Design a protein with these regions (language model features):
Chain A
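Active-site-proximal alpha-helix that buttresses catalytic centers in soluble enzyme cores
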Residues: 9, 68, 76-189, 249-252
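Src homology 3 (SH3)-mediated interaction modules
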Residues: 1-65, 69
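Short glycine-rich phosphate-binding loop at a beta-alpha junction
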Residues: 161-169, 193, 267-276, 281-285
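Structural signal for hydrophobic/aromatic residues that build the beta-strand cores
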Residues: 5, 19-27, 40-42, 85-90, ...
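Acidic, low-complexity terminal tails and accessory targeting/binding regions
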Residues: 57-84, 94-103, 200-218, 265-266, ...
Length: 360, 360
């Protein structure tokens, strides 16, 4: 049986093997009686030639002659129960760049939308209550779309298997989820589960009223790939404006527990392997506060003090990520490095050629 | 004869007509004896219904019944000689985000390139003198590629016809030109003319030596769409390190004059129309300083004081643009608004989940 590694694994003992994502590992079922509990013995097909220490094997490399491959005794931590949760913040939102009055900047005298700067999206989706609603539920900027797509492509490069996608009902989160799935080439295979319980702390984002989010029908009409069979744990009607910090913390803690228990944890094969039946990553696209409020209860950490919380949340960039892996013991989770790197880029400022170039 | 408008034209007299890019205009050659010099008389097929004041016609709309169309006497400034030059700065370069030591951040212990942050390009092209050369000639970041592509798509939206593309020999400029052409869907139809005379003021960018730019053969091998028949006005060997401001100003002034005289100015058809034979836009992709040093001599303006110059250049963002249009009088150029809007976006900061989320 030949398996393909899903994640990198760094050896922690001399009888363990360095595994890169994409490595092909031969596992002989007859040999497994020698393996200690939770481990398997296998052989890596990866060449060990000094010249190509980082070579990654794919389907074709499988046909390399065995003389170029090295054979290594291999122990793999058997996490047949291992799951992972990737929590990410949405991409750049238009009001982050153009301020609260962004929509006014984009309306013609007769109320039509136009693109006042090339970072505004080329069009807005239809909303039953009119464009005005987008002031409380702003879309991604073009830069936000670029960021989301890039992260999706990077996850694909790392051969991360995403099996479930949950999103806050905020338009920017649904859009981010959609563009990440496009980058992953999983659109429309994996559908987005819109979970109102993932919305931002309402004290920050809904001080007077919960925004009129786009309905499932509207999202579908705008070509968003929504899972219509999904039943939310927290219906929209359960969200209240200006909730207390304690209420937000307990809502977040409840929703992450409900999400993880709704995604199957039993699987028949060893860890690291992208095979049907192996639980893939549960992707959750939500808000900057979600990176702490969803992962800390999962990892068994206490919630942050409400004052520290605001300060911490300000440091989280677009597409900032936290990654939790389930441990050998079921429902024990640990925060580890996300499967892809950070995304760091500069700002691009407004430019007035008349003042700058023509002026004397 | 039905013509399609290439640019918007705002009427300046009551016998002139508002024209949007894409409008179809019927011009009867028999009527032109009534037109004053430099103008033509024509009829707009655009509907004037109050409900759709901004409707833009395309090929299909051509078939609208005449009852929905309005007929207007039309005067068009006849700029049969009119050309336009669009000077743009390259996109975000990797060292702008990651500093001068960017390449060291991306090398494994055995000297292989890897992507230390997702804004680094996924690979570097081959260079005969090795990767080290890219330290003096850095590539675009992924964000820079996004910016370039977006501007190309916006030019296409505005139906701007680009007929000639010139680029500085700096890799970031050639890459920007290529991605703008891809956005314009003109790749590989329009080929890039690499002109060393367009390189940055060497006092800033080449204080000790002129960088080892990629050769034409290397650029072609890396799939850049280079015009191999182009003979540079300023060969690479003519560039000297640490040139004086006066030398830079006179080089820039000479190169823009040579470029405009090398691109045909005579054309048989009226202005605004994207027809074969009508001169399209001459696109020049170069450096922030080029926005002033190329356009000011073209528009007959004196060069800036060298101290003001440095201050002005710092204000120019990625893909900052200046646009010069030739006037009725040949070789008289005026700076006007570029055909597309500015691009303004925010920065994305580095993020350390361990310190931010896990720390207490």
């Amino acid at each position: 049986q030949t398996l393909r590694a899903l994640f990198q694994y760094k050896p922690q003992n001399i009888d363990e093997l360095m595994i890169n994502a994409g490595d092909l590992i031969y596992v002989n079922p007859a040999q497994q009686s020698d393996a200690s509990e939770g481990w398997v013995i296998g052989t890596s097909h990866r060449t060990k030639s000094e010249k190509e220490p980082n070579v990654k094997l794919n389907g074709e490399a499988h046909n390399l002659s065995m003389s170029r491959s090295a054979t290594n005794a291999l122990s793999l931590q058997n996490a047949a129960l291992r799951r992972a949760v990737l929590v990410m913040r949405h991409g750049e939102r238009v009001d982050q760049v153009f301020g609260r009055s962004w929509l006014q900047q984009c309306l013609t005298a007769d109320g039509k939308y136009y693109r006042a700067d090339l970072n505004f999206p080329s069009s807005l989706p239809r909303q039953k209550d009119g464009m005005k609603q987008f002031e409380c539920d702003p879309p991604l900027s073009c830069c936000g779309i670029f960021q989301s797509r890039l992260i999706g492509e990077a996850l694909l490069d790392q051969e991360v298997t995403v099996s479930y996608v949950y999103s806050s009902p905020a338009l920017r989160c649904v859009q981010t989820a959609q563009h990440v799935l496009q980058g992953l080439k999983l659109n429309p295979k994996v559908r987005i589960r819109v979970e109102p319980g993932l919305f931002e702390w309402t004290k920050w984002e809904a001080s007077r009223a919960i925004p009129n989010f786009m309905t499932t029908a509207e999202l579908l009409e705008a070509s968003y790939n929504i899972d219509t069979s999904y039943r939310a744990h927290f219906p929209l009607s359960s969200l209240v404006p200006t909730e207390s910090y304690e209420d937000y913390v307990s809502r977040s803690s409840a929703v992450i527990k409900q999400i993880t228990s709704a995604c199957p944890s039993k699987a028949p094969l060893p860890p690291f392997f992208a095979f049907p039946g192996v639980p893939g990553v549960i992707l959750i696209v939500a808000h900057s506060s979600s990176l702490a409020s969803l992962t800390r209860p999962l990892a068994g950490l206490p919630s942050r003090d409400s004052r520290d919380f605001a300060q911490m949340v300000r440091k989280i960039p677009s597409l900032g990520m936290c990654f939790c892996e389930e441990q050998k013991e079921e429902n024990k989770w640990q925060m580890v490095n996300p499967p892809v790197k950070t995304l760091t880029h500069g700002a691009n400022t407004a430019f007035d050629w008349r003042n700058t170039i023509l002026g004397d």
